[in-house]
């Protein structure tokens, strides 16, 4: 536990020019109510981290979402999840949030409400744990709340459905493929051919080359023009157009991870579009600019708590596994390089992870 005379730490924080930097005088988060203080052992860089620039940057707010670490201190109301000091945990927090500026993953210490924490089994390292949070939280929100897919992991649907995950080699993609298989469904996916074996190892029943001009026809044939659900992990206008074209004649549901194109949505009224923002699963206010602003949502927090409980059971039973990693040296000092590599699209089929400290 940090000494109470120690109230500052090293952390990656926002700057006044819309960028970020490593500071050595950031405050350690205060612990109250159901919050838990965690000594960070590893962090991973996610696409959302690379997008928080300009108006999405709050000066001096701590950045970062995905982390793993050791429980250092429990708030007085953190009594419902069986956590104790010394437990190995991982999850995601909302970094660069004006409504909660002292909390972010890219720091020596972070803090989270107890019910969003995943307990790491002995078989999973801190580095692997740092890849789990935002991917599995976002996938659960997208699949089982936004799309409303029947069944749940540990409670499989009675009738398997063929479901498309566009971008299956992404971290959200591999998480979604596993969750769909555990929910009793038949996941198919698109990715580059060099990632076919990867996505199949995570549960894809079949994989299609998104660059092949015949892929849309192949998927329509594969699904007998009856595809009802599509999760778009790439979330561009072109990926949305692809998903809209392969959803079956009777229509269905489409969910992306970024705001979708209203113009594409107008092309098929029988398809119901939605988009989700993974950090909103915590139910807290996220004070980013529109359209990413989220008010406090207790109903969403309840879903988040229930979903985290499911993930904890899946981890305990070793039914889900982490995304592949690129482990990099340098800790917090090298976060900027990871962000730049993501922006330059230099990373495919792996998540950048930085171990911190000893």
Curated annotation (Swiss-Prot):
InterPro entries: ADH-like_C (IPR013149), ADH-like_N (IPR013154), GroES-like_sf (IPR011032), NAD(P)-bd_dom_sf (IPR036291), PKS_ER (IPR020843), Trans-enoyl_RdTase-like (IPR047122). The keyword Membrane does not apply. Keywords: NADP, Nucleotide-binding, Oxidoreductase. It comes from the Eukaryota. Substrate binds at residues 134-141, 278-282. GO terms for molecular function: nucleotide binding; oxidoreductase activity, acting on NAD(P)H. It is an enzyme of class 1 (oxidoreductase). It holds the Pfam family ADH_N. NADP(+) binds at residues 48-51, 169-172, 192-195, 210, 257-258, 347-348. Belongs to the zinc-containing alcohol dehydrogenase family. This is Trans-enoyl reductase pvhC. It comes from Talaromyces variabilis (Penicillium variabile). The gene is pvhC.
């Amino acid at each position: 536990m940090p000494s109470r005379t120690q109230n500052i730490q090293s952390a990656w924080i926002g700057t006044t020019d819309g960028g970020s930097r490593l500071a050595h005088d950031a405050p350690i988060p205060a612990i109250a109510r159901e919050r838990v203080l965690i000594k960070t052992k590893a962090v991973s860089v996610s696409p959302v981290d690379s997008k928080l620039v300009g108006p999405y940057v709050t000066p001096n707010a701590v950045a970062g979402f995905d982390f793993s670490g050791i429980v250092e201190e429990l708030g007085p109301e953190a009594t419902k999840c069986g956590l104790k000091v010394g437990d190995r945990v991982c999850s995601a927090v909302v970094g660069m949030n004006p409504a909660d500026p002292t909390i972010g993953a890219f720091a020596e210490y972070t803090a989270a409400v107890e019910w969003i924490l995943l307990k790491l089994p002995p078989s999973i390292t801190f580095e692997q744990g740092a890849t789990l949070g935002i991917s599995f939280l976002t996938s659960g929100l997208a699949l089982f709340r936004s799309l409303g897919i029947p069944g749940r992991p540990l409670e499989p649907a009675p009738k398997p459905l063929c479901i498309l995950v566009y971008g299956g080699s992404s971290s959200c993609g591999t998480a979604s493929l596993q969750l769909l298989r555990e929910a009793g469904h038949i996941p198919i996916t698109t990715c580059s051919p060099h990632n076919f074996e990867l996505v199949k190892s995570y549960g894809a029943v079949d994989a299609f080359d998104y660059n092949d001009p015949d892929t849309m026809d192949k998927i329509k044939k594969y699904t007998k023009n009856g595809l009802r659900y599509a999760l778009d992990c790439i979330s561009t206008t072109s990926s949305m157009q692809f998903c809209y074209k392969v959803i079956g004649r009777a229509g269905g549901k489409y969910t992306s991870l970024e705001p979708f194109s209203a113009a594409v949505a107008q092309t098929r009224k029988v398809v119901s579009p939605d988009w989700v923002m993974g950090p909103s699963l915590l139910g807290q206010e996220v004070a980013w600019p529109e359209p990413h602003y989220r008010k406090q949502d207790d109903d969403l927090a309840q879903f988040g708590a229930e979903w985290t409980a499911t993930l904890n059971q899946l981890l305990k039973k070793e039914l889900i596994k982490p995304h592949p990693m690129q482990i990099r040296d340098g800790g917090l000092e090298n976060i900027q390089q990871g962000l730049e590599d993501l922006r330059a699209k230099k990373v495919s089929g792996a998540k950048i992870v930085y171990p911190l400290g000893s």
